[in-house]
Swiss-Prot record:
Protein name in the entry: Penicillin-binding protein 4
Record membrane topology: Peripheral membrane protein
Deleted gene: phenotype: No visible phenotype. Double pbpA-pbpD deletions spores have greatly decreased spore outgrowth and peptidoglycan synthesis.
Swiss-Prot/TrEMBL keywords: Carboxypeptidase, Cell membrane, Cell shape, Cell wall biogenesis/degradation, Glycosyltransferase, Hydrolase, Membrane, Multifunctional enzyme, Peptidoglycan synthesis, Protease, Signal, Transferase
Organism listed in the record: Bacillus subtilis (strain 168)
Top-rank lineage group of the source organism: Bacteria
Chief location: membrane
Active-site residues annotated for this sequence: E96, S388
Source organism phylogeny: Bacteria, Bacillati, Bacillota, Bacilli, Bacillales
EC number: 2.4.99.28, 3.4.16.4
Any one Gene Ontology cellular component term annotated for this protein: plasma membrane
C-alpha cells in the first residue's frame, strides 16, 4: 500500500504540474484577478541569498600556506562561473539537465518519463530533477524522496529561477554538489582527488571527478575506482555526442590513465595555528566592539555577547577569509624540536613563545612536548606562578624608576617580615647589604620584597597594568606578588610579551601573530591598531638590561648564555618547585619558557639540568 500511495502521489504531481506551469505563464484576465502565484510564493518562501560555506586560509610570514580551515565539515573552494572549464559545465548539462537553459526550473516532459519509469518499476527511483531542483534541494531542503518534498522543491526552483540568472544557478550548483569524503564543489574535488586546481585538470580527469556526484557513495574513487571510471567513460561519450569534444579527444581522454593524488591535510604547525585561531577571535572582538561590551557586561548578558562573538567569527570563517601571520617556520621547528628533546620524563611538560620584539610579532610557539592539534596549549592557556621572573617587571623596574637607583646601588638583603609574612631567601640563607646586581643575578628574595614595599603595592602594580595579564585579580595586590605569588599566574606568552618592553627602550607595544585578515578577494578586513606605552624610562630600561645580562653571564641563568650582541633574562621558580621559568631576550628576540607538570607538583629533581634554560638557548642560538 505504501508503494501504491507513492506512485499515486507521483501521478497526482503530474496532474498538478500543468496547472502550476499554467499559473506561471498565463496572462489571462481571470488569472490576473486571482492572487498571483508569485505573491503567494514570495510570502511563503523567503529565499536567502546563496551564500556557500567556503574554506579559509592561513599563511606564514612569507605568504606560504600554513593551514586550510574547513568550516561545518564542508571542504569547498568556490570557483567563479568564468573560471569553471566549459567541459565541466557541459558534462553536467548533458548528463543532468539537457534543457537547463530552456525550462523555468522544472522539466515537465522529463517528469513524465520519470513517473512512467517509477510506475513501471513500482519504486520511486527516477526523479528527473533539473539542475535548479537539485540546487534547491542542496540549499534549502532535505533529500527525502516524497510527493510533498517534490512539490516544495518545485516551488523553490521556480523562486530560484526568478531571482537568479541561469549562469548564477549553474555556478552555485557546481559549487554545492557533493563529491564524497567531505568535499563540496568542483574546485575542492579537483584539489582533493588530484592535488591541483580545476583549471589544470585534463578532460579525462574532469570527467572522472564529475562522475562522483550522481551517487557519491557508489562512485567514491577511493573505494570504487572501477565504478567511477566506467561512469567517467559514459560522461565522456555524452560530451562527444553533444559535439563538445571530437572522437579523437574522446579516445584520448578514455585512454588516459587516471592517477589519484589525494590531498594530504595536515597542520604542520598545530601549536601556532591553535593560537592564531584564538587571536582571530580577539581581533574581531576588538575591531567590532565586542570587547568593550564584554567589559561592561556580566552574567547572562555577558554569555549572550560571547555567543554573538562566536557566531560572528563562525560566519567570517564560513564566508572565507585569508589570515596572514608572522609565523617563522624555521624558528617554529626549532622551538618544537627543543621542547620535544629537552624535557625528560613523560609527565614533565612545557610551553614557550618567541617574539621578534623589533616588529612586535609572535613568530613561534610551543604548546607542549609532543603537542598535537586540539591539545591543551600551554603557550597561551597555562596560567602558572611566574616566580622570580616577575621581578624585573614588578619589583626592580618600578624601584629603579622611582628612586633613580643603579645596578651598583645597595639594598638590604637581610630577613624581612611584615606582620605574619616572612619570606625566605633560597635555602633560608641570610645576607647583609648587597648591590642590586648581586641581588638580581642570584635571585635573592628579601631585597625584591623591600623594593615592592618601598615603592608601594598600588604604585608598583600600575607598572604592569598595560600588560593586561588576563587573570590578575584584586587579591594579588599583596607583598607575595613580589616573588611571583599570584592567585592564578601568567602564561608563557603573557610573560614573553611583557618582556619585549626591555627590547624596546622601556616602551611596550602588544605583540601579535596575525598581521592582517582579508576576504578571499584580498580586501583587508582586520588589522591590529596598537599604540605604544612607555613603561620605564630609557635610563631605567638600560639598568634593567644590565641586571638581566648579569644573570646569564654569572648568575642563575648561565646555562642560557651563547654568543650574541646582547643576551639577558631572568629565571623563576615557584614555591615547592612547581614551576621553572626563564624569560629573556637577545638584540632581536624575546622568548619565554615554562617547565612543570600540568597538575602542579614538584620538579625539583630537574633543578640541576634546568631544561628551561637549555630550551631557550637551543631555540634562539639557531637564529644566530
Amino acid at each position: 500500500m505504501t508503494m501504491l500511495r507513492k506512485i499515486i502521489g507521483w501521478i497526482l504531481l503530474l496532474c498538478i504540474i500543468p496547472l502550476f506551469a499554467f499559473t506561471v505563464i498565463a496572462s489571462g484576465k481571470e488569472v490576473k484577478q486571482m492572487k498571483s502565484l508569485d505573491q503567494v510564493l514570495d510570502k511563503n518562501i523567503d529565499l536567502k541569498d546563496i551564500s556557500l560555506v567556503q574554506n579559509s586560509y592561513m599563511y606564514d610570514r612569507d605568504g606560504s600556506l600554513v593551514s586550510e580551515i574547513v568550516s561545518d565539515h564542508e571542504n569547498r573552494v568556490l570557483v567563479p562561473f568564468n573560471k569553471i572549464p566549459e567541459e565541466v559545465k557541459q558534462i553536467f548539462l548533458t548528463s543532468e539537465d539537457r534543457h537547463f537553459y530552456e525550462h523555468k526550473g522544472f522539466d515537465f516532459m522529463g517528469m513524465v518519463r520519470a513517473t512512467a519509469s517509477n510506475v513501471k518499476d513500482k519504486k520511486i527511483d527516477q526523479g528527473a530533477s533539473t539542475i535548479t531542483q537539485q540546487l534547491s534541494r542542496n540549499l534549502y531542503l532535505s533529500h527525502e524522496r516524497s510527493f510533498s518534498r517534490k512539490l516544495t522543491e518545485l516551488a523553490y526552483s521556480y523562486q530560484l529561477e526568478k531571482k537568479y540568472t541561469k549562469n548564477e544557478i549553474l555556478e552555485a550548483y557546481l559549487n554545492t554538489i557533493y563529491f564524497n569524503n567531505g568535499v563540496y564543489g568542483v574546485g575542492s574535488a579537483a584539489q582533493f582527488y588530484f592535488s591541483k586546481p580545476l583549471k589544470s585538470l585534463t578532460v579525462g580527469e574532469m570527467a572522472f571527478i564529475c562522475a562522483i556526484p550522481n551517487n557519491p557513495t557508489l562512485y567514491d574513487p577511493l573505494k570504487h575506482f572501477d565504478y567511477t571510471k566506467s561512469r567517467q567513460e559514459r560522461l565522456l561519450k555524452g560530451l562527444k555526442d553533444a559535439g563538445v569534444i571530437t572522437d579523437k579527444e574522446l579516445k584520448k581522454a578514455v585512454k588516459q590513465k587516471i592517477k589519484l593524488d589525494v590531498e594530504k591535510r595536515e597542520d604542520k604547525y598545530p601549536d601556532y595555528v591553535s593560537y592564531v585561531n584564538d587571536e582571530f577571535t580577539q581581533l574581531v572582538s576588538e575591531s567590532e566592539g565586542f570587547d568593550k561590551r564584554l567589559q561592561k557586561a556580566s552574567g547572562k548578558q555577558k554569555e549572550k555577547i560571547e555567543n554573538e562573538l562566536s557566531a560572528r567569527v563562525s560566519t567570517l570563517m564560513k564566508d572565507g577569509v585569508k589570515i596572514y601571520t608572522a609565523l617563522d617556520p624555521y624558528m617554529q621547528n626549532q622551538v618544537v624540536a627543543q621542547m620535544n628533546s629537552k624535557l625528560p620524563y613523560a609527565d614533565v611538560q612545557g610551553g614557550a613563545a618567541v617574539i621578534n620584539h623589533q616588529t612586535h610579532q609572535i613568530i613561534a610557539l610551543s604548546g607542549g612536548k609532543n603537542y598535537q592539534k586540539y591539545d591543551f596549549n600551554r603557550a597561551y592557556q597555562a596560567y602558572r606562578q611566574p616566580g622570580s621572573s616577575i621581578k624585573p617587571l614588578l619589583d626592580y623596574g618600578p624601584y629603579i624608576e622611582q628612586t633613580g637607583a643603579t645596578t651598583s646601588s645597595t639594598i638590604d638583603a637581610s630577613k624581612f617580615c611584615s606582620k605574619d609574612y616572612c619570606p625566605q631567601n633560597y635555602n633560608n640563607r641570610t645576607y647583609g647589604t648587597v648591590t642590586l646586581d648581586t641581588a638580581f643575578k642570584n635571585s635573592y628574595n628579601t631585597p625584591a620584597i623591600r623594593m615592592l614595599d618601598r615603592v608601594g603595592i598600588q604604585k608598583a602594580f600600575s607598572y604592569i597594568e598595560p600588560y593586561h595579564f588576563a587573570k590578575l585579580v584584586d587579591s594579588d595586590y599583596l607583598l607575595p606578588a613580589a616573588l611571583g605569588g599570584f592567585t592564578n599566574g601568567m602564561t608563557p606568552l603573557e610573560m614573553t610579551k611583557a618582556y619585549t618592553t626591555f627590547g624596546n627602550s622601556g616602551s611596550y607595544t602588544p605583540s601579535h601573530a596575525i598581521t592582517k585578515v582579508t576576504d578571499l578577494k584580498g580586501k583587508t578586513l582586520y588589522k591590529w591598531n596598537d599604540k605604544a606605552t612607555q613603561i620605564f624610562s630609557v635610563r631605567t630600561n638600560m639598568q634593567l638590561k644590565k641586571l638581566m645580562s648579569s644573570v646569564v653571564k654569572s648568575g642563575t641563568g648561565k646555562k642560557a648564555y651563547f654568543n650574541a650582541p646582547y643576551i639577558g633574562g631572568k629565571t623563576g621558580t615557584s614555591n615547592d618547585y612547581h614551576d621553572m621559568w626563564f624569560v629573556g631576550l637577545t638584540d632581536t628576540y624575546t622568548m619565554g619558557v615554562w617547565v612543570g607538570k600540568d597538575t602542579p607538583t614538584s620538579v625539583e629533581y630537574l633543578h640541576s639540568i634546568s631544561p628551561q634554560l637549555s630550551i631557550w638557548k637551543g631555540t634562539l642560538q639557531a637564529a644566530y
